[in-house]
């Protein structure tokens, strides 16, 4: 979705994948040596801000608050980046940031209110049976309608059980099911493929 929005607006996109070891320098940039001299190497948020691109802040709820604090001035009325030891750069007018996150995965947490308030939060609905079957047909054209329907029902049944707390949410992973189907293509039996 985020990449499609960038393409629709004709803007370059930076995919910034967050993790627990992410720090402010990873986002805005850091000093490095080039030909024996100290030079500033811009990070993805800095480059996105200069070019008027779309910054896709992927899995933003994996990062620590200290790393995310640099985004506050970027995302509010200031629309600027303070680069310690260098300068304050304004964001190009076209610059936009889109954050994505999944709940309930290991290492994720709730975002603090100061950061959340700088975004328009869109809760994505869960996939419908019809759309799941379309996705399966698009990804696996060799799958018969019978199996497309069975895998869609399997996923939706697991989803219902997760929603009612009958099973762990770890059992439900659309990406995992798609990977299992790819393994099936390579000859792995259905049971072991789903176990992986």
Regions found by a protein language model. Give the residues of each.
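AAA+ P-loop NTPase catalytic core and its hallmark functional loops
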Residues: 1-156, 163
């Amino acid at each position: 979705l985020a990449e499609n929005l960038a393409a629709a607006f004709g803007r370059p996109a930076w995919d910034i994948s967050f993790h627990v070891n992410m720090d402010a320098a990873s986002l805005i940039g850091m000093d490095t040596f080039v030909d024996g001299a100290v030079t500033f190497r811009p990070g993805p948020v800095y480059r996105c801000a200069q070019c008027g691109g779309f910054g896709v802040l992927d899995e933003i709820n994996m990062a620590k608050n200290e790393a995310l604090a640099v985004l506050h001035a970027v995302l509010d009325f200031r629309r600027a980046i303070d680069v310690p030891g260098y300068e304050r750069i304004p964001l190009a007018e076209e610059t936009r940031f889109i954050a994505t996150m999944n709940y309930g995965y290991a290492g994720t947490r709730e975002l603090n209110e100061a950061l959340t308030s700088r975004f328009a939060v869109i809760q994505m609905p869960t996939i419908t049976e019809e759309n799941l079957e379309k996705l399966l047909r698009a990804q696996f054209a060799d799958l018969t309608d019978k199996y497309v329907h069975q895998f869609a029902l399997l996923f939706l049944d697991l989803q219902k059980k997760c929603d009612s707390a009958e099973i762990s949410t770890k059992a439900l992973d659309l990406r995992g099911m798609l990977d299992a189907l790819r393994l099936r293509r390579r000859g792995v039996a259905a049971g072991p493929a789903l176990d992986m």
